[in-house]
């Protein structure tokens, strides 16, 4: 038995990959754990539309009916959105158990990367990656996303790490694991809702084509994933000091209620949504759409690079 027995790829995504067309993977914990129905369904449809408008095929990934689904759509997408309250949150450690036990799960950045790589998708758009939580020196709460980035050949386009995390420690961990952090038209690592964290990226890139060349060579050299940090649009960015005050309040609430481990991030995001009177969610949707557009452009550039490489190989032959 191989991974192919547990992977279900939609016909649209399969045809696109076979034809060398650009495909962008999308995660599903934002659907199952990020916002309520029907806003979650509206959001994913908007994000998929952004990917299409920018020339690529969207591939929303989730665990459903004992399969890792790549390219969830139609009635299944609505079922995923409606069932969010009952769905599990699947990281790397959960995949085998959830595939055997069945049920439905939203995939984290780590699991989405795994499924994308197995399917042959090289570019993935998300909101923000997980990372080192504040206080990790005592809780050891560090996301599996960072380890996955070090070993799986997928480029992740994001608005940095979620602001609720310890961003300096997250970047140090990425450095330890040899994960290159590329700033898309920026030298400052973005902080999800805020455009700047005060921390520097490893390398600034100016275009999707430039990003594609770096990513392609990274993979050709047999190295792991690449993080492309793309700041939230200025029109939707939140004030860094104001959001920090809300984050600190949300963390105090989590500590008071004993919330920890994989329940912590959804709890904090929900509490911050309440404290900002919904502004954080509006910003979240805007940054995901922005990342989807950039990811589609990078996927298109990588597809064109692949086509040129094949042409050169044929010419030499």
UniProtKB/Swiss-Prot annotation:
InterPro entries: Indigdn_synthA-like, PsuG
Record-linked Pfam families: Indigoidine_A
Reaction equations catalysed: D-ribose 5-phosphate + uracil = psi-UMP + H2O
Enzyme active site: 27, 162
EC number: 4.2.1.70
UniProt cofactor note: Binds 1 Mn(2+) ion per subunit.
GO molecular function: hydrolase activity, acting on glycosyl bonds; metal ion binding; pseudouridylate synthase activity
Subunit structure: Homotrimer.
Entry function: Catalyzes the reversible cleavage of pseudouridine 5'-phosphate (PsiMP) to ribose 5-phosphate and uracil. Functions biologically in the cleavage direction, as part of a pseudouridine degradation pathway.
UniProt protein name: Pseudouridine-5'-phosphate glycosidase
Species whose genome carries this gene: Sorangium cellulosum (strain So ce56) (Polyangium cellulosum (strain So ce56))
Upper lineage: Bacteria, Pseudomonadati, Myxococcota, Polyangia, Polyangiales
């Amino acid at each position: 038995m191989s991974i192919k027995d547990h992977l279900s790829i939609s016909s649209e995504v399969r045809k696109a990959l076979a034809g060398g067309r650009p495909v962008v993977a999308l995660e599903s914990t934002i659907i199952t754990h990020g916002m309520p129905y029907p806003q979650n369904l509206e959001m994913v449809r908007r994000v998929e539309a952004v990917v299409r408008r920018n020339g690529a095929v969207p591939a929303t990934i989730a665990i459903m009916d004992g399969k890792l689904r790549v390219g969830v759509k139609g009635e299944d997408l609505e079922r995923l959105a409606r069932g969010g309250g009952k769905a599990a949150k699947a990281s790397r450690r959960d995949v085998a158990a959830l595939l055997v036990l069945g049920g439905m799960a939203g995939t984290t950045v780590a699991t989405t990367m795994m499924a994308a790589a197995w399917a042959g998708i090289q570019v993935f758009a998300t909101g923000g990656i997980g990372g080192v939580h504040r206080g990790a020196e005592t809780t050891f709460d560090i996301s599996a996303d960072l380890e996955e980035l070090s070993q799986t050949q997928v480029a992740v386009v994001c608005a940095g790490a979620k602001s609720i995390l310890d961003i300096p420690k997250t970047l140090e961990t990425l450095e330890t694991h040899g994960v290159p952090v590329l700033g898309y038209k920026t030298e400052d690592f973005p902080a999800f809702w805020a455009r700047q964290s005060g921390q520097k990226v490893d390398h600034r890139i100016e275009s999707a084509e430039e990003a594609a060349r770096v990513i392609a060579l990274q993979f050709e050299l047999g190295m792991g994933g690449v993080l492309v940090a793309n700041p939230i649009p200025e029109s939707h960015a939140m004030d860094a000091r104001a959001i920090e005050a809300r984050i600190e309040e949300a963390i105090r609430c989590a500590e008071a209620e004993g919330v920890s481990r994989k329940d912590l991030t959804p709890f904090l995001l929900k509490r911050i949504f309440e404290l900002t009177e919904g502004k954080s969610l509006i910003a979240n949707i805007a940054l995901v759409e922005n990342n989807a557009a950039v990811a589609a452009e990078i996927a298109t550039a990588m597809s064109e690079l692949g086509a040129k490489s094949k042409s050169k190989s044929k010419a030499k032959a």
